């Protein structure tokens, strides 16, 4: 069914940009506004959204949509769906276009209406998606609850002698056992020096005494993603390992303590980064502090030194400082946080302190 409140927010954003119409084609944005879940692959999927009047869906008859929620124009593989869209748009007014729309559809539309102004207007949808409504918040809490549970299960499952691949496969199987659609990204399990690569892919590295153990994991539940990272040690950590872990955890907590409506996202990055830099590890924190998340694990928006956007209620993003020492080890501690009216809600509840695993 149509998500009228969400659609009204997008329409208001279009009006604010001086637009009266938009083509939405990102499948996740189409679902967000209409409830129609389609993966079009090479075929055309589009939602024509005017600021006044009824929206129009353009669907291939191969798509399994038995009861479309609004006016629908159907096409087959031998039809010309762009010509159908050309009949609906108002060529005398600027047309907002989704950044995801392939050139093979956009260019023929522009050739059909050569005088029509085309404007990139993805932000009108993306900025609305950035602030989750109550339904979305509930779904993301549940995805994070499952992530916490599987993280805890993996923490107790892991033993010295296991490979990264074995443990990552266990985590993915646990997600399926909890009824998830799957992992929200390739599960990261990193032992020892492998953890100094923030995006290491699990391989046949065997866990041994003295290694750090980094899990970066997330699941998709009800179409919404979770994401978290915890770092532990196989055996008692060295003094340096424990100190770096404590530093990263404190950086995570320092940023989270500042979160409330109106704070600039760059201020959160600075709070974590300054702490790590003052301890002498600034050069080894080599990525932004966080990213937005929702139907995908990385949505538009980040928590970085360059982003002066202010936090608004409903935003959900990660806080994930890290220190990565090549050839030695890496530590990252990550939570998802929901901006509330008065502060923030940390969606991940698992302990962030270092612990000994694998025994």
What is the role of each PLM region?
Residues 1-359:
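Active-site neighborhoods and metal-handling regions in enzymes and metal-associated proteins
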């Amino acid at each position: 069914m149509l998500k009228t409140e969400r659609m009204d927010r997008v329409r208001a954003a279009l009006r604010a940009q001086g637009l009266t119409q938009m083509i939405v084609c990102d499948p996740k944005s189409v679902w967000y506004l209409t409830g129609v879940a389609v993966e079009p692959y090479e075929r055309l999927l589009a939602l024509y959204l005017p600021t006044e009047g009824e929206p129009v869906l353009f669907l291939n008859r191969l798509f399994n949509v038995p009861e479309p929620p609004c006016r629908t124009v159907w096409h087959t593989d031998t039809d010309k769906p762009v010509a159908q869209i050309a009949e609906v748009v108002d060529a005398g007014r600027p047309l907002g276009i989704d950044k995801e729309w392939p050139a093979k559809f956009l260019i023929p539309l522009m050739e059909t209406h050569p005088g029509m102004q085309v404007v990139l207007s993805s932000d009108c949808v993306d900025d609305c998606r950035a602030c989750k409504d109550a339904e979305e918040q509930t779904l993301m809490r549940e995805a994070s609850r499952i992530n916490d549970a599987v993280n805890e299960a993996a923490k107790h499952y892991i033993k010295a002698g296991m490979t990264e691949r074995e443990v990552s496969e266990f985590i993915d199987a646990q997600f399926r056992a909890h009824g998830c659609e799957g992992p929200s990204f390739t599960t990261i399990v990193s032992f020892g020096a492998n953890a100094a690569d923030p995006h290491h892919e699990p391989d046949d590295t065997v866990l041994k005494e003295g290694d750090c153990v980094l899990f970066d994991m997330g699941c998709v539940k009800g179409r919404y993603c979770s994401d978290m990272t915890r770092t532990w040690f196989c055996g008692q950590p060295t003094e340096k390992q424990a100190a770096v872990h404590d530093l990263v955890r404190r950086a995570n907590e320092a940023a989270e303590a500042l979160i409330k409506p109106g704070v600039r996202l760059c201020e959160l990055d600075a709070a974590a980064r300054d702490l790590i830099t003052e301890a002498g590890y600034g050069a080894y924190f080599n990525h932004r502090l966080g990213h937005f998340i929702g139907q995908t694990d990385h949505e538009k928006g980040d928590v970085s030194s360059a982003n002066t956007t202010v936090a608004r209620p409903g935003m959900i993003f990660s806080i994930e400082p890290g220190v990565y020492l090549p050839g030695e080890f890496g530590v990252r501690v990550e939570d998802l946080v929901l901006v509330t009216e008065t502060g923030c809600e940390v969606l991940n509840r698992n302990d962030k302190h270092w612990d000994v695993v694998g025994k």
